[in-house]
Every structure is written in C-alpha cells, then in structure tokens.
Amino acid sequence: MNVYLVGGAVRNRLLKLPVTERDWVVVGATPEEMLLLGYKKVGKNFPVFLHPETKEEYALARTERKMAEGHTGFACYASPDVTLEEDLLRRDLTINAIACNDKGDLIDPYQGEKDLNQLILRHVSEAFIEDPLRVLRVARFAAQFAHLGFSIDSVTLDLMTKISQSGELLTLSPERVWKETEKALLSPSPHIYFQVLKHCSAILVLFPEIDTLCSPLRCPLSHGLSTLSIAAKLTDQKEVRFAALCHILGKKLTEYDVLGTHDRAVLKRVPLCDLNKIEQLCERLKLPNLFRELLKHTLKYRGLVTIINRLSFPLLLNFFDELDLWRKPYRLEQLILISKADESTEGGVEGKHDYQAQYVREAFNIARAVSVKKILEGGFRKEAIQKELTRRRNQALDQWQKQKT
C-alpha cells in the first residue's frame, strides 16, 4: 500500500502558491483495509475515505470508462492492481496529474511539470472529451492562472469546442454549472472564464442570454468582460463581479413613475433594462438570492448613479426605498462599484463618477439620520408615520443642499 499526494496541492506547491487542501491517492489497498485502518468511507460512486485524524480525502486508485452521457456517466474500477499512472491518466490536465510520494519525489508520467514551466493548460489524454464538466474546469483554471501567464493549449481548446458542439454540456446540472462559475468569479481574472467559454462556443449553451447580445458587427459581451475585469480589481465580492458582467443584458428604456417634468427629462437620458433575460438566467442556473437581487437592482438602477445629483429629492428617496437601503445600506456601495467599473470601461471621467458617488453617499446619510423615534414621540401613528418620515427626509435634504450652495 502506497500513498501519494496528488492534484492541486502538488500543482500549487510547484507554483509556490498557497495550498488550501490536500488530496491523496492510495495504490495497492482495498476498501476493507482502509476501514480497518480507521478511515471513514464517504464516496458513493467510487471509494473515497476520510483520514481518521486530518479528515483529508484519500481515494483508492481507479480507472474510469465512459458508459453514458454527462459528467456522471462513468463506470469506475478501483482495485489494488490499478497503478498510479493509470489513475493519473484519467485526470483533466497534465498540471493536475502530478503525484508526490512521502519522500518528496515527483511522479509525473504526463509531463505536467514541463507544462507548468511553460505555462500551458493541456489535456492529459483524448479521454478529456468524455467529460463535459472539463470545459468549465479548464476555463476556471485559465481564469485562476491568467495573471501568471498561463494559456490553453490549442488542441485542448479544440477538444473543448467539440464538447460544446456535442450537446453534452446540456447534461450538466444547473447547480454544477453555477458551482464552477462561482469559483471562477473568485479568481484573479474572472473575465477570462467567460472569454474562454465564448471562444469554445460553450457560452452559447450555458449563458445564451449573454451570447445572444453578440452580432457580427457588435458584441456588448466585450464591454461586459471589460467591466468585469475592472470590477475584479475593485472588489472580491462575487455577486458584484457577476452583476458587473451582466449589466449589459436586455438594454431597453424603462419608464419610471416619476414625480415631475424635471425627472422625466433627466430619465429620458438613462438607458435602463428589461428584466426578462436576467429572470431567465436566474431561474435556469438557480442562482442564490444574493445574486438575483443585486442583478435586478443593477439592471434597473445602475444608470441612475451616473446622474444621481440631477434627480429631485422625492425621486432620490424613492430610489433609496426601492433598494431598501434603510435596512441594507451595503447595496448602495455595490451599485457605486459597478457603476465605477462601467464608467472606467467606457473611458468616463473618474472625477465625475467620484463626485456622483460622494453626492449619493452624503444624501443617503442625511436622509438616514432623520429620527423615527422623534416622529413616534410626536404622536404620529400608522400611515402617518411614513408620510411624516418622508416629509422630514425631504426637508433635511433641502437644508443640506442649501448649505452646499
């Protein structure tokens, strides 16, 4: 029985990157032997065990054979006679198919270390094409390591395109697609993930709402990717990054229930959005509410941030109400970040955005400072409370504006 460290831990160690988790492969053992040693079995489809002390995963060496469509359509064979080289052969990329023994020696039958040194993401074997999830995984690794200079081997990219055209991507569950996407959003270069998916025709299958925006003459996706790239430098919040990409969806003028001719004139200049496409995206991928809410707010209100100082105070307060900023003030900063990334992409004047951002922050703090307690002490009840609160907030904003001028 021999135990080897494999996968991401070996790869990251060679790249001098942090190792967050360690996976092990066991050669020459049976499930019964693992149980006798105190390991706990956790794998359903193949023998994976948890170490009794470290709780790290130890998998018996295995081979896989394609039996049906999809990521789970494999028959696994795990036996003491399966070699380490056979186990490594089933892995996706050469850089993930390197093992290390207890002496620190590398076992690298597929030249993964060479590809690491040459900054190449390359498939291990032709069996790569059998698992559709690998399209997402390779795109994610491209996003994870783009800042180091990694690129995808051209033959590997061709295989990814074949998978995309085969229809097998449709067999992936929404949860699995989103899991890989969410990981990619946390990478240093999340825009590369979607760029790769576009290049290998996977975005048409997995994110059709985004892909359909592209035409031979114009592709708003490029703007979305640029906005995402800038947003990734401004924040590590994955929901903000995703909203920065998706703010390009469904451009359409949307009417507001505005309160005056001044507001109507201002809002005519703000292209807002149809929420149908974002609803489709959210439902199909089963996005968490945190993402859904920010996406909808971004599509509806991001444009207002760029002209926020031109809105009347009644409309500004309505904006605060609809975002529920009184209970969730962080939403304002999220919209400001997305707007900043978008304006930077379009070559906007940074000072202008900073002015609008500071204006809306100050206005919100002024409005939020109005005391509800004093209104209650004044004898107001039921509907009169909200009416009086709005009146006092308008009054406070008027006084603030007079002081500024």
Curated annotation (Swiss-Prot):
One of its GO terms (molecular function) is ATP binding. Pfam families: PolyA_pol, PolyA_pol_RNAbd. GO terms for biological process: RNA repair; tRNA 3'-terminal CCA addition. Keywords: ATP-binding, Magnesium, Metal-binding, Nucleotide-binding, Nucleotidyltransferase, RNA repair, RNA-binding, Transferase, tRNA processing. Residues 220-326 form the HD domain. Mg(2+) binds at E21, D23. Gene3D superfamilies: Beta Polymerase, domain 2, cca-adding enzyme, domain 2. ATP binds at G8, R11, R91, R137, R140. Belongs to the tRNA nucleotidyltransferase/poly(A) polymerase family. Bacterial CCA-adding enzyme type 2 subfamily. This is CCA-adding enzyme. The lineage of its organism: Bacteria, Pseudomonadati, Pseudomonadota, Gammaproteobacteria, Enterobacterales.
